[in-house]
UniProtKB/Swiss-Prot annotation:
The keyword Zinc applies. One of its GO terms (biological process) is proteolysis. A motif (JAMM motif) lies at residues 174-187. It comes from the Bacteria. It comes from Variovorax paradoxus (strain S110). This is UPF0758 protein Vapar_4033.
């Protein structure tokens, strides 16, 4: 059925006005943001295709503007920019709520926080969560970009930043834009090098988390620390 042929009570905007946003399905809310479909695909169908392709709202939150191009109807810069802006606001809101919990006391909380911040980056980044003695977040810093090796991640810089923030512990992290989250031997070697360097200033390495869009890997959970 063409969107214009839907009865008024079934159209997302009218439904939201009459019954509130909570009454709408994910695809209906997304359709309100997209506003229009394309030839052969109404806006509700386009919204549902986006959700199906990226694995629901959680997967959509990890997408980039480049990822959206694979969906017919999302080729225009304006539509992609509007959706990416809304997704970024959602990520920031979720990150604020996670930070308000203050204590990063479980791998699950850490992985969720890092997914929101670096999981969808199209390039590789190395970031560090600097924590106090109660494992409360002091700051997340992205320290290096590009292919990460022992020669591109400098232990001295990580140690310097830990001293600057007076951190008691850290969580190391980086992303794999390729999608694979298995650590390489270089990842494991780098972790041990940084762990040894930070131990000299009594800073504990609690974990090294690898993330990609929709996936994460904790070295601590796997017994690699």
């Amino acid at each position: 059925m063409a969107f214009k042929d839907l009865p008024a009570h079934a159209r997302p905007r009218e439904k939201l006005i009459a019954r509130g946003a909570a009454a709408l399905a994910d695809a209906e809310l997304l359709a309100l943001l997209l506003r229009t479909g394309v030839a052969g695909k109404n806006v509700l169908q386009l919204a549902q295709e986006l959700l199906d392709h990226f694995g629901g709202l959680s997967g959509l939150l990890q997408t980039s503007a480049e990822d959206l191009k694979v969906i017919k109807g999302m080729g225009g810069d304006a539509k992609r920019a509007e959706l990416i802006a809304v997704l970024e606001l959602a990520r920031r809101a979720m990150a604020e709520r996670l930070k308000e919990r203050t204590v990063f006391d479980s791998p699950g909380t850490v992985k969720q926080y890092l997914q929101l911040h670096i999981g969808s980056r199209p390039y590789e980044v190395f970031a560090v969560l600097f924590l106090d003695a109660q494992h409360r977040l002091i700051v997340l810093e992205e320290l290096f970009r590009g292919t990460l090796t022992q020669t591109s991640v400098y232990p001295r810089e990580v140690v310097t930043r830990a001293l600057h923030h007076q951190a008691a512990a850290v969580v190391l992290s980086h992303n794999h834009p390729s999608g694979s989250i298995e650590p390489s031997r270089a990842d494991e070697s780098l972790t041990q090098t940084l762990r040894a360097a930070l131990s000299l200033i009594d800073v504990r390495v609690l974990d090294h988390v690898i993330v990609s869009a929709g996936q994460s890997y904790s070295m601590a959970e796997k017994g690699l620390l």
